[in-house]
Amino acid sequence: MVAKKGRRDSSDSSPIVEVGEIDTSAPFQSVKDAVNLFGEAAFSAEKPVFRKPNPQSAEKVLVKQTELHLAQKELNKLKEQLKNAETIREQALSELEWSKRTVDELTRKLEAVNESRDSANKATEAAKSLIEEAKPGNVSVASSSDAQTRDMEEYGEVCKELDTAKQELRKIRQVSNEILETKTVALSKVEEAKKVSKVHSEKIELLRKEIAAVNESVEQTKLACSQARKEQSEIFAEKEIQQKSYKAGMEESAKKSLALKNEFDPEFAKKLEVQLTETYNEIDELQKQMETAKASDIDSVNGVSLELNEAKGLFEKLVEEEKSLQELVESLKAELKNVKMEHDEVEAKEAEIESVAGDLHLKLSRSKSELEQCVTEESKAKAALEDMMLTINQISSETEAARREAEGMRNKAKELMKEAESAHLALEDSELHLRVALDEAEEAKAAETKALEQIKSMSEKTNAARNSTSSESGSQSITLSQEEFKSLSKRAEVFDKLAEMKVAAALAQVEAVRASENETLKKLETTQEEIKKLKTATEEALKKAAMADAAKKAVEGELRRWRERDQKKAEEAATRILAEAEMKMASESSPQQHYKAPKQKPVNNKLEKTKTSVVSKKVLMPNLSGIFNRKKNQVEWGSPSYLPGEKPF
């Protein structure tokens, strides 16, 4: 046994016990005194004499005191565990906030990487478009002058006009395609509406037939009900007649029995009793038959009424369905009207589009004739394209390499996103663990409150017991068995080990999250370095594209000069022809004019031909950019067309 002893001052008559501590100062000095004090004897108003001491009550008090002591120990341990859990929670919350911040930073960096990747892709696409638009011409050009800038501006305006015309054509084609699609959709809707209307009309006819059949069945059921009621009334009348006859027979038999009793012949009485029993049996059988007939009649009436109610419900449902079908037919008619209106509008738009398409076909035929003339001239310029093709191939290979690098960056960004998601999942797991720890802390708090309440109740009980006893001084001993002491110590060790295990698990999770975040940061740094390399590569590609644009502009300036020379030559030739014609007309005499007048027609025809040639050359000037773009299908890369008389440089 384990004993704890202490002493109390003689001046303290009533002990003051603090909550959470055990008062070791006892009012007795020996075990016998304790047994005498804490026995069954208690002071009462009726019997001031002490009762015989009970040793069980003293043992109960000792057990309660030991339980109080152990509860206080457990309370202290729980408080320590609570403090540890709160510290762990605060650490985990701070680590959670830090990890959330890191995740947000990582997401921002990923977004920046994606934006830079998109910008790099856009830059590469722009470079490709510039390369595709670039025309061949590997020529050393002199310093730009005012004339060249004007020529380039005029060429740009012509190209813009051509592009606007192409855009208008594309818009018209798109509109025509959309109108055709709407027309087909409208026609399909009309056909579907017709089919639906046919189906609904067939359904309406079927429903009408069903309604007529139901009405006939309802009338038949009504007739059957009336007949059944008549038969029921007849059966009831017959049963009443039979009952009256049975009652009359019973009365007659009763009278006969009374008369026979008066006569009192024993043998005859026995016979009458036998007859009475037989009549009673027959009456019982008849009553049973009556009851069965009534039950069958009631069942038949109930069945007929149920069938009537079901027929009425079906009739009401059919009426409602007929109304809904009529509403559907009306709505379908309205939709048909709307579809017809839309169909008429679509036909009007189609007529307008067909007229516009006819005009466009005429323009296309003219442009095709001009294209055929230009194709014959463009065959001369293929030799000058080879050098430019080499440079363009190099630039395209570089752009493809940049694209591949961009795709690699995309894949890396996707991997980083996956890693970020895994980090998010790890954070969520840690949050779950934290929540579990918080729940455990709350449970510990609840246990603490329960233990405090128990301690308060036990302390109140002990105070009451102490106040009831006398103020004798003595020694107090708290006894515990070895098994209880060992079990309590084992519990304390188990609780300590569990707390340490939980703390270690939380720390391991936090370290794993930190390691994953460090890995993601390293990968982000590597991706940023690769993005910088990509930016440098794209800048080089843009520089090369700018060089190609400069070469293109130089080629276009020289083409413009050659065209202006040809135009000047054509205008000079036209003016010479006109001057010669006027001189011939002035030199001829008046009598010869009558005979030579019909010969002036070919001169006028020549003048008209020269004018048309000049006009055709002027018309060919704005159409050159369109010709260059259209010729890309025949030649691998675009080439500038040359007018007759021009030489490839």
Curated annotation (Swiss-Prot):
Keyword rRNA-binding applies: no
GO CC annotations on file: plastid
Basic and acidic residues bias (residue ranges): 443-453
Residue stretches of biased makeup (Low complexity): 468-482
Chain segments annotated as coiled-coil in the UniProt record: 59-227, 267-356, 391-461, 505-549
Region entry Disordered, spans: 443-483, 583-611
Annotated InterPro entries: Web
Keywords per UniProt: Coiled coil
Xref: Pfam families: WEMBL
GO BP of this protein: cellular response to mechanical stimulus
Bias (Polar residues) ranges: 456-467
Entry similarity comment: Belongs to the WEB family.
Protein name (database record): WEB family protein At5g55860
